[in-house]
């Protein structure tokens, strides 16, 4: 470790110094840089070390856990010179005013004792989710299901506005991880499994959060922290914070792509993957942190660790012998701020490492510059706190946006015999553990880390309450109930199944609301992707009645239901639609609104067949000729991009501007979409490409564009896409981007057209 990981950073610097410097990802601002240098030259070593450390607010709490202890604040800021604080008091959301008052107290003391403003950070994930009076939107996985970037923009704008209103200038959002393993407990925090979808949605959210000028972030915007850089979402075991093994070409082509898009959009900070890639902990990976981002992108932003992950380098990963060695490893690899929640002596250790020469003064100053630059760009030196009136806080407009986003995100997966929509006079029986739970509708990062919406937001409707408000005859019996202890999300009480089945006998239709209770991060790890045995037993019991069952899936990841899906007449996946999700579902089931969501992930059918839509062509093979029974057929419950509507759409006239192209060309693609049904409807039009022959085994297809349109019955609209030829390139075995001569198939809505690349091009730059 000592002979390899630490010298790697120096090696990268040497290479970078000899290579042409790329244009900066964020253009430098002379006034910003002058301010940074003027502050830096006056700082002591201890002050510099303190700027690199971020502590949890719990270290400042008094015995009530609801207020700051002035003596503790004096020590943390006066003795340790700490530059950043994060999180919420008592591990629970507070009001905007309570949060603002707390941060004002910290800032006043920071300016008094250090002369440098503190920067406060919070995990705001799907809105102002750590404010009791804030606006919540559907989780990222739902926004991905809309295939409508406007909702990522709306959520980002509202989140920034309300967070800044609480004096918080930095959010740990958006989540950039690709949700490509359905076992992973954080899949719901992503926009889905596809890199292009993730990149488009995350870029919209980033720009909405930060605004258009990253050097001057206004008082209605906040700094983002792209997380978790990178490859975090595909742990080999499916368990959170465990190792990933990713080929380098896939790492750059798929996992880096969304980050690249957002770095180029001006993202000011990024949080690092808590685990490891190919045996190297990401927090010690100089190639990725310093090489791929700081050097190859000429990015002057800040890398912050995730929770206590410097400690994990020695406690868990065993690549360092102790805390000091771990600090040196991380900082020399490119970490600029250490989220060390409970240990202020981290500051002292950094001072010692600099004095011992194990962290160079140049690396220290570089990290401090990045921290100061962030604070200058946020205007914190001019206004550590601010008195702006936020008159649009929690405006009804934000609630309407959230409702609309939920409507467009909930996915109709099955509608046998057109059982949906339901007439309001139908006798409806509602059951299942998710029927009457706001906690389940919201998921994690909702008022509390593990989710606790019922405690904080009783004014919103659960699924049951929304159905009772919309339909005339609704009865309810849960059948299965969750243990509401925060860390016991998998525990269920199934003693009420027989009672629920008996109560359903008089109904015309049964709505069974199943799925998961809320969880977040490692506590969400599990050993079986199947929907729980108790919930399946409930559905099987209900099926004996011969009544039509509408299965509502309220879950953060696609739990396997292949054995009970045939028992259901309709299936709706609402995922985690948040506070307005119950009302959205009622509007959809009644026909007041139309379904238009599509799955942003592949819904697997079998436990040993967890595929993504862009699998390799060699993974799907029919039986080979002869005696060798080669069975490798893709069989999923529902594919990526699947979703039904109450109307129907026909695609025609798929055309491309040229049947032959070169590397510098832009292909113009058009397709006609017609609403052939009797209802107004929205349709997400998805464009794919397939490379038919390549020097590496190609993916069967890749998403290259999408657009959401609304059509009246009988209306036809021509959807246009511009597809740069470079978008069809892939990363070869040598790590270089390449577009190879040969045939490609472009497809959309079941139609296909062939085009030919007439030349091969290999790029020498790492990013195109």
How does the language model describe each region?
Residues 1-25:
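Bacterial Sec-dependent N-terminal signal peptides
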Residues 16-731, 741-752, 763, 768:
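Glycoside hydrolase catalytic-domain context in secreted enzymes
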Residues 737-738:
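Surface-exposed, short loops/turns at beta-strand junctions within beta-sandwich domains
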Residues 753-759:
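Edge beta-strands of extracellular beta-sandwich domains
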């Amino acid at each position: 470790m000592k002979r390899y990981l630490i010298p790697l950073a120096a090696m990268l610097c040497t290479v970078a110094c000899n290579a042409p410097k790329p244009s900066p990802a964020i253009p430098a601002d002379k006034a910003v840089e002058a301010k940074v240098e003027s502050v830096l030259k006056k700082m002591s070593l201890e002050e510099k070390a303190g700027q690199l450390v971020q502590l949890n607010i719990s270290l400042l709490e008094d015995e009530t856990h609801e207020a700051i202890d002035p003596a503790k604040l004096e020590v943390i800021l006066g003795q340790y010179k700490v530059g950043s604080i994060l999180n919420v008091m008592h591990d629970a959301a507070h009001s905007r005013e309570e949060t603002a008052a707390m941060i004002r107290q910290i800032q006043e003391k920071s300016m008094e004792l250090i002369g440098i403003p503190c920067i406060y950070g919070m995990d705001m994930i799907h809105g102002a989710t750590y404010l009791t009076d804030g606006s919540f939107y559907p989780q990222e996985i739902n926004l991905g299901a809309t295939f409508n970037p406007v909702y990522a923009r709306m959520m980002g704008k509202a989140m920034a506005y309300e967070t800044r209103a609480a004096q918080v200038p930095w959010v740990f959002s958006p989540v950039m991880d690709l949700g490509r393993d359905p076992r992973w407990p954080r899949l719901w925090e992503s926009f889905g499994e596809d890199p292009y979808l993730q990149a488009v949605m995350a870029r919209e959210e980033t720009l909405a959060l930060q605004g258009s000028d990253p050097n001057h972030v206004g008082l209605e915007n906040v700094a983002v922290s792209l997380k978790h850089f990178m490859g975090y979402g595909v742990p080999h075991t499916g368990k959170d914070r465990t190792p990933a093994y990713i080929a380098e070409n896939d790492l750059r082509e798929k996992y880096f792509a969304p980050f690249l898009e957002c770095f180029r959009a001006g993202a000011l900070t990024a949080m690092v993957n808590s685990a490891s890639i190919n045996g190297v902990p990401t927090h010690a990976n100089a190639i990725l942190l310093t090489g791929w981002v700081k050097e190859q992108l000429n990015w002057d932003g800040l890398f912050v660790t995730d929770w206590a992950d410097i400690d994990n380098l020695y406690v868990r990963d065993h690549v360092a012998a102790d805390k000091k060695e771990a600090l040196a490893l991380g900082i020399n690899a490119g970490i600029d701020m250490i989220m060390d929640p409970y240990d202020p002596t981290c500051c002292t250790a950094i001072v010692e490492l600099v004095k011992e020469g194990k962290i160079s003064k140049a690396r220290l100053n570089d990290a401090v510059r990045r921290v100061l630059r962030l604070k200058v760009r946020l205007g914190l030196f001019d206004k550590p706190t601010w008195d702006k009136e936020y008159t649009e806080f929690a405006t009804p407009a934000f609630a309407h946006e959230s409702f609309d986003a939920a409507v467009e995100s909930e996915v109709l997966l099955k509608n046998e015999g057109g059982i949906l929509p339901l007439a309001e006079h139908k006798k409806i029986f509602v059951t299942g553990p998710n029927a009457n739970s706001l906690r389940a509708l919201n998921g994690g990062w909702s008022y509390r880390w593990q989710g606790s919406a019922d405690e904080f937001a009783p004014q919103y409707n659960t699924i049951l309450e929304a159905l009772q408000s919309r339909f005339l005859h609704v009865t309810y019996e849960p059948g299965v109930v969750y243990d509401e202890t925060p860390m016991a999300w998998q525990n269920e009480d199934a003693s009420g199944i027989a009672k629920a089945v008996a109560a359903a006998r008089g109904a015309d239709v049964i709505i069974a609301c199943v799925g998961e209770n809320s969880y977040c991060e490692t506590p969400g790890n599990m050993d079986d992707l199947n929907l729980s045995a108790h919930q399946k037993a409930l559905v099987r019991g209900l099926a004996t009645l011969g009544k039509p069952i509408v299965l509502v899936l309220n879950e953060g990841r696609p739990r396997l239901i292949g054995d009970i899906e045939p028992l259901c007449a309709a299936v709706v996946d609402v995922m985690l639609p948040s506070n307005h999700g119950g009302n959205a579902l009622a509007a959809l089931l009644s026909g007041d609104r139309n379904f238009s969501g599509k799955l942003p992930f592949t819904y697997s059918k079998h436990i040993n067949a967890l595929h993504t839509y862009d699998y390799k062509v060699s993974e799907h093979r029919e039986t080979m000729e002869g005696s060798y029974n080669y069975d490798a057929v893709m069989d999923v419950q529902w594919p990526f991009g699947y979703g039904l509507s109450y109307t129907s759409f026909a695609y025609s006239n798929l055309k491309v501007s040229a049947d032959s192209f070169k590397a510098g060309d832009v292909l113009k693609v058009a397709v006609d979409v017609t609403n052939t049904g009797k209802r107004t409807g929205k349709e997400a039009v998805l464009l794919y490409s397939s490379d038919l022959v390549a020097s590496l085994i190609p993916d069967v297809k890749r998403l290259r564009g999408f657009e959401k349109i609304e059509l009246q019955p009988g209306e036809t609209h021509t959807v246009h896409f511009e597809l740069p030829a470079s978008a069809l390139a892939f990363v070869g075995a040598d790590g270089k981007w390449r577009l190879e001569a040969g045939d490609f198939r472009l497809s959309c809505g079941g139609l296909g057209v062939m085009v030919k690349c007439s030349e091969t091009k290999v790029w020498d730059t790492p990013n195109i």
